[in-house]
């Protein structure tokens, strides 16, 4: 996943430069990227025409001082390394080295993920720091988050798009297994990991992709293996709720996953058992919406919210957004409930702690009024977003944007398209195409990683 344009790292240094100068140059590049990232973050950019290159303002004394200090740190770091190597000492035990690495981590935390590949290719130290989970913990602590959109349009194959760098990312192919390939799969991005849940011949299985190692691994297990559940992540943690166990029983149980420790913890169960539900985090709480309950094929109209601090679930009646084209109000909800078995789980996403839902039948997007427990139309879906009863199209949040991943129906090929819009109070949604490429146009799974 550490990919970058080669021109960012192939710049020639003056012939008189020694290793110390290279260190200063490398640190200077990191600071330049860091400052450019901050300038881009502080600039109001809208629409596809806003992709610009901004130059760092060296007239700002505060930032210039930071560059000078960091260049001096880089010089000290190199001098420390040379003295350790010359004296035969243990480099790892040097307190100065550790201090300098912390300073470099702080600089790297402000750089864009799009630039990490270039930075990693400059030397082993930067490469090691970028593969260190501590860097991403530091970014979260500073409130620095960028998002990558992962999706699968071909079985066992994943690809990703980086909106900030406007580039497609290669993801290694998953290990081939016919049973897993044909099973229902759920996906979840949490921390620096992409989790894909499915079933092999004898048991459920979880495949984990790490952007730090660019590899897939398996072997991790929940306390209660399941499928067809609702899930959502918040930083380094995720919650899964409901679903079906290996015997097909619909579950009310829930678990919390910590990506930093790799541990699954059982949390209190929901009030109602449900499968094929959808989940989001909003206002720091976990919501589970809709789903099919025990003993029937009708969609549950209620939702539930889990308070992570109080560790309690609260039922929310009639929270399900309208899902049919058969009119409004309770009648539409009853029609939607009756046809639940053939429909995808509710298409919901949260942007700036506001909940949105996509109605594939009416091609509409609605916003949830938390105070009144009602849904109000705020716009339409992109024109070329198609689905089969909600299947094959992804509706997700990507930072401050809503994104729709999908493509028009086509015979013998097609393309995938990523549309995005920034929802704003009192205005209709204005969609724009972020990216498109030749691909299968049925989205099997999709997850947005923020790190």
Curated annotation (Swiss-Prot):
InterPro entries: F-box-like_dom_sf, F-box/Kelch-repeat, F-box_dom, Kelch-typ_b-propeller, Kelch_1. One of its GO terms (cellular component) is nucleus. Coiled coil: none annotated. Residues 93-139 form the F-box domain. Kelch repeats lie at residues 137-188, 193-236, 237-284, 286-333, 349-395. Keywords: Kelch repeat, Repeat. Gene3D superfamilies: Kelch-type beta propeller. This is F-box/kelch-repeat protein At1g74510. It comes from Arabidopsis thaliana. The lineage of its organism: Eukaryota, Viridiplantae, Streptophyta, Embryophyta, Tracheophyta.
């Amino acid at each position: 996943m550490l990919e970058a344009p080669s021109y960012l790292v192939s710049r020639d240094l003056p012939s008189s430069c020694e290793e110390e100068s290279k260190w200063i140059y490398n640190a200077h590049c990191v600071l330049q990227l860091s400052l450019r990232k901050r300038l881009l973050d502080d600039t109001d950019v809208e629409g596809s025409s806003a992709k610009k290159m901004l130059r760092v303002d060296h007239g700002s004394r505060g930032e210039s001082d930071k560059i000078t200090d960091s260049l001096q740190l880089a010089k000290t770091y190199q001098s420390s390394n040379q003295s350790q190597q010359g004296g035969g000492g243990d480099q790892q035990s040097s307190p100065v080295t550790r201090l300098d690495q912390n300073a470099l981590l702080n600089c790297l935390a402000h750089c864009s993920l799009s630039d990490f590949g270039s930075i990693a290719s400059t030397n082993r130290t930067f490469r090691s720091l970028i593969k260190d989970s501590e860097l991403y913990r530091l970014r979260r602590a500073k409130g620095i988050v960028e998002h990558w959109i992962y999706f699968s349009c071909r079985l066992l194959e994943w690809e990703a798009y980086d909106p900030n760098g406007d580039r497609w990312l290669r993801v290694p192919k998953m290990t081939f297994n016919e049973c897993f390939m044909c099973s229902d799969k759920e996906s979840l991005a949490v921390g620096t990991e992409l989790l894909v849940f499915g079933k092999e011949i004898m048991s459920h299985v979880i495949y984990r992709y790490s952007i730090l190692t660019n590899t897939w691994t398996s072997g991790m297990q929940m306390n209660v293996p399941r499928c067809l559940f609702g899930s959502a992540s918040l930083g380094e943690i995720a919650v899964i709720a409901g679903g079906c166990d290996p015997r097909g029983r619909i579950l009310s149980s829930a678990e919390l996953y910590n990506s930093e420790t790799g541990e699954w913890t059982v949390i209190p169960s929901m009030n109602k058992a449900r499968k094929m539900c959808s989940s989001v985090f909003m206002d720091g709480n976990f919501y589970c919406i809709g789903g099919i309950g025990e003993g029937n094929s009708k969609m549950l109209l209620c939702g539930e919210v889990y308070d992570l601090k109080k560790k309690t679930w609260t039922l929310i009646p009639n929270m399900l957004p309208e899902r049919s084209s058969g009119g409004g109000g309770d009648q539409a909800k009853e029609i939607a409930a009756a046809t639940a078995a053939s429909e995808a789980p509710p298409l919901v996403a949260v942007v700036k702690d506001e909940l949105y839902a996509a109605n594939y039948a009416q091609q509409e997007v609605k916003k949830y009024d938390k105070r009144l427990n009602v849904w109000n139309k705020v716009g339409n879906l992109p024109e070329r977003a198609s689905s089969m009863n909600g299947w094959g199209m992804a509706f997700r949040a990507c930072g401050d944007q809503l994104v729709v991943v999908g493509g028009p129906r086509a015979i013998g090929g097609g393309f995938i398209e990523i549309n995005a819009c920034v929802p704003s109070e009192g205005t209709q949604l204005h969609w724009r195409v972020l990216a498109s490429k030749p691909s299968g146009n049925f989205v099997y799974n999709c997850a947005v990683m923020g790190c």
